[in-house]
Structures are given as structure tokens and as C-alpha cells.
Amino acid sequence: MKQFISFLRKEFYHIFRDKRTMLILLAMPVILIVLFGYAITTEIKSVQVAVLDQSRDEATTRIIDRIGASEYFELYKVLDSYEEGEALFRQGKIRLLLVFPPRYASSSDAPVQLLADATDPNEATQITSYATAIISQWKMERQSEMNAVTAQSPGGNGQLSAGITPVVHLLYNPLMKGAYNFVPGVMGLILMLICALMTSVGIVKEKEIGTMEVLLVSPMKPIYIILAKAAPYLLLSLVNIITILALSYFLLDVPIAGSLTLLIAISILYALVALCLGLLISTIANTQQAAMLVSAVVLMLPVMLLSGMVFPIENMPVILQWLSNIVPAKWYIIAVKDVMIKGLSAGAIWKEVSVLAFMVVVLIVVSVKRFKIRLE
Amino acid sequence: MNKSNTINLSGIHKNYGKVNALQDISLDIKSGELFGLIGPDGAGKTTLFRILTTLLLPDSGKASVCGLDVVRDYREIRRRVGYMPGRFSLYQDLTVEENLTFFATVFNTTIEENYDLIRDIYIQIEPFKTRKAGKLSGGMKQKLALSCALIHRPEVLFLDEPTTGVDPVSRVEFWDMLDRLKQQGITILVSTPYMDEASRCDRIALMRTGKCLSVDTPAGIRSTFSRLLLAVRSASMYRLLEDLRAFPGTYSCYAFGDAHHLTLKEESDAGVSSVVSGLETYLQAKGYTDVSIESIKPTIEDCFMALQPEA
């Protein structure tokens, strides 16, 4: 036990005395949160819109006003011709063009044409659906106004609308904030980076400078060497979890709907998976550079691409969906979203927890087996 | 297994892929001996150390340390030996004292417990104990590494090229320290590429390209040198080397610091003097005026050069 504590102290000396490590450990969570929170946002804001209004009546004017007033859109120009709109699309001045047919107000179900720049398909889908929502809301309101008018004059021949109007209620994230999605993702990313990358680099560094040789030729059991190398990073990742949660709660207004204890417990489980992956990498790589490269390619890319953090897994080809199952971050992100955003209890995430626990067991067995008690 | 032998090696082979790192090495190192492995880079010294410190498995052959098998009893061996690898294997970002404390705890001991053993060495670096190990000079690093390897009072000490990259004064000091450790009853196996350090060992093994060429005391090895050895000096040494090699009576000639060491084909004492006078005339004819030729005692390096592997 004294051996172990002394080893731990040594590990903390290494971490605290290396400015670069400290920078990665402390600054990265803050940078990532701020970057994702403010710079890299998938939310729609101030999209430039042009309008070709061929009826110029009371109805179209009110719709145009509403579009312009919404925070999603900014009215760029009211056009005189269709060609003008095409030119603006080509110049990249506008992302959406609304075309009202002649005599729009007098025909109750006249179509409005929406033209969107679909170079970014996701954005185009979002823009058009937002615009559609604004228009149909206006239509609904007018309908109810008209119904009210007809109701006041009995015997009037006002027609009741037979259309079905969906009432949309967004669960868990009513404001559709991007932060709700990326905070769990950033947590998955940072824990993976700190636990896996730092642990693997830390162990490989001892191999590289030759101290591993001395440690191996000592009575210290290899399992203690592994544990002592991994433990500090588990502790530091806890600090990071708390930093991220605090930042997202106070800075980005992401609520913590579920139990904080449960959230931290899953995070520790996930950190363990990452630590074991780091150990596994350290048994393969012989130089710090190789360890870093393997960590980046084998761990970071899947976390970014296959975890559902950036791209929805449901939209991927079947083989990638299947592959995403072995990405620990996928399960972690699902569990964190369930607990943090939806406020679900432990019973709802048993599947994710057992997948992660299974991964820990398999990885520990494999990496302890692979850890060499000798040099080759 | 002989009890008075601390280290036994018999028929050890080790290959790295196609490279034969060690070929049929058999050695017995006695208890309390200061034993030197002498040979250039690539001789297989480090591989041999790693097999004995249980870091590598031999491909074939048997090896034991303190009567314990290096493969089967690796755990117990690791408890009993001290190892200082060839590279400077300390934590550069830890201070002198932190390094020593760390290695003491790893070996389940404290600095105080075995301070008497390392005092002579550690006292020289103690004034710098709050300095980071990475900021020490080569000689001080080496003293710290030795202190760390000794802190748990090992029965056997393995030192892999401890004097490489260390200044000549520190090297002499280092060997003095090893002498004192030997008096404490510690068996020491040390390797070095410097032939001049060989004479400080009780016995040495000359190694080259994975083979053990000869094992004996330094004096014993020197006595096997049968030919007359001449040191030849002149103002233009480079031209002299070529001319000496071109001399028909020359057996071998190598540049050794300030003189060329020359051996002759003629081995009988009677014949030698006539060959030497023949050499003087040969050199005079070549235009040398300041040549000095003297008979010298062979060094270990001369013996090593003479032990060319039979191709």
C-alpha cells in the first residue's frame, strides 16, 4: 500500500509539473464547451430570406412581417422577379426564397413556394420547416379569427376548416437548443481523451525513457503499476466532469433534470472504459507519438463520428450503425442524455450501463493479459 | 548448481528475428566478484543483462541468479537484484530526493534504512537534492542512478554501461565506488565498452557480436598475448600506419592513441630482433627520421583486437 501511495504521488508530480499536460487537462473542457456553445452551433439563426410577392395583399404582408420578425430569419430583399432570386442564390446572399402566388389572400389554400439553398441539406431542411411552421401558424390563427367572426353572426355561411392541424410540443428541449445535444457529446469526448490518451501516453513514456525497465525489475506487482498509472487520471476526469456540468449549467443554461449522483456514477463507469482502452493502447504502442496517434485515430474519430454526437446514428448505413455499437461513447451519450436532459432514473438506462460494464470487464482482462511483465 | 556461483549461464541463445544477439553464452560468476562484460556496441551485453534481470526470455539455455531460475523464479529475482539500465532511467521531472524516495518505497524500504550503503555516493549529490534529476550533470546522474539501484541493498548489482557518457574523472571515481561496494559483499556485474576499465574488474569476459571470446582475469587475458608488441611513433602518424601495414613482416597494426601497436609474424625471440632491425631500415628507407620503436606490455584492448573471431 505504501508502494502504491508513493507511486500515486509520483504520478501527480509528473502531471502537475508538466505545463502542457496541465493545459490539456484544465483548459480543454472549457475551450470545448465554449467552442461548441458559441462558435460551432447547428442552430438556425438570422438566415437571409428574399420574398417574391406576386399578390401584395394584406395576407402576404403579414406573413412577410412575421418571417422578418422571427429570430431565425432576416428579410434580405423583396424581389420583383424570379430571376433576381436566382441571382441572389448564386451569389450566396440568401438561403431561402418565398414565392407567393397572385391573389394569395382570396384563395384559402393557395400554395406558397419555398426555395432553399440545399448545399447544406440539414440546414435546408430546418430552414424550410421553420418557414413552413410560421406560415401554417399564421394560417391557423386566421382560420380561428374567421371562425370567431362567423360564430358571432349566426346563420353566416362561414366554412369550418376540415383540415387537421397538428399541435407540436417539443419534449425535453422545448427551445431546441444545440447545447442539450453537444454537452453529453463533449463529456464523452473529454473523458475519452483524458483517460485513454493520457494514460496510454503516461505508460508509454515510462517505456520510452527506460524507467519501465527499472520498475519491472522491482518487487512491485505489474497490476499496481497499472493501477497507479490510471488512478490519477480517473480523479482528474472527475474534476473535468464537474467543470463541464457547471459550465453547461451556468453558462449554457442546460438543466440537470435527473440525479447528479447517477450522472457522475455513469461518468465514472465510462471513464473506466476509457482508462482500460488507454491501457490496451499502451501495451501496443512503444513510443509516445504512436500512442497519441492510435488514441486519436482509434478513439477520437469514432467518438466524434460514430457516437451520435455529430451525426444521427439512425441515418447511417447499417454497417456503420452496427459498428457504432462498439463505440463506448455512443452508450455513454445515450445514458447521459436520458439522465441529464430527460431526467430519467437508473432503471431507464440499465442497458447502457450493462454494455459499458461489460466493456470494462473485457478490456481489463485483455489489457492485464497483454501487459508485459517482461520487455517483449 | 554450484553454490559459490551467484550467476550461472549455460548455453544461452537469443535471436531478434534474424539477428543473433547471443550465441551459446556460458559463464559462471562467483559470489562477491566484480565481473566485467567488455565489448563494443552490438556485442550483446545489454541483451545478456536483460536476460539475467528477467526482462527477456532466452531462446534456449539456462540461466540462474542467486540459485534462482531467471524464467521460473523471476519474481524472487526481482526482489533481490539491483539494476541500472544503460539509459539514464530516472524521472527527469522529479528531484534527486524524490527519485531516491520513490525507488526506496517501490522496493519496500526507506532511505534511512540503508543509508549507510549509499552514503559515500549519495553524500556527493546530497547538496543538490532539491534539483530536478534532468538538470544534473552526467556524473551526478550516474551517482543518483547508482544510489537508486542500491537503495534496497541488493545481493547482485547489474550495471549496464554505467560509465558511458561520463567524464574521465567521474569514471575513475565510479570504479572506486564499485570497489567499496564489492567490499560490502555485493556481487557486481558491470558492462563497459571502455577497454581501459577492464583492469578494474576481478574477471572479465570479452564479447563481440553475441559471442563470448574469452573469460579470465585481466592479467590472465593479457598473458595469453603471445606475440611481441611494439609501440611505434613518428611525427606523421597516418602515413606511418599505412607504411607499417605494408611492411612484409607485419602481422597486425592498429592506431592506439599516440602510438601504433604493431605485432610481427615472427614469433620466436631469436627471429624477432632481426625483424625489428629490418623494420628500422625499412622505415629509414621510407624517409622517416624520428621513428621510435619500443616493446610494450599488451593491454586488454590489444588482446581484444588479437581475438578476431575466426571467420
Predicted regions and their residues:
Chain B
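Short, charged/small-residue-rich alpha-helical element at the C-terminal edge
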Residues: 226-311
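ABC-family P-loop ATPase nucleotide-binding domain
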Residues: 1-13, 310-311
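ABC transporter nucleotide-binding domains
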Residues: 7, 14-207, 214
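Residues that form or flank phosphate/diphosphate-binding pockets in enzymes
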Residues: 72, 113, 216, 239, ...
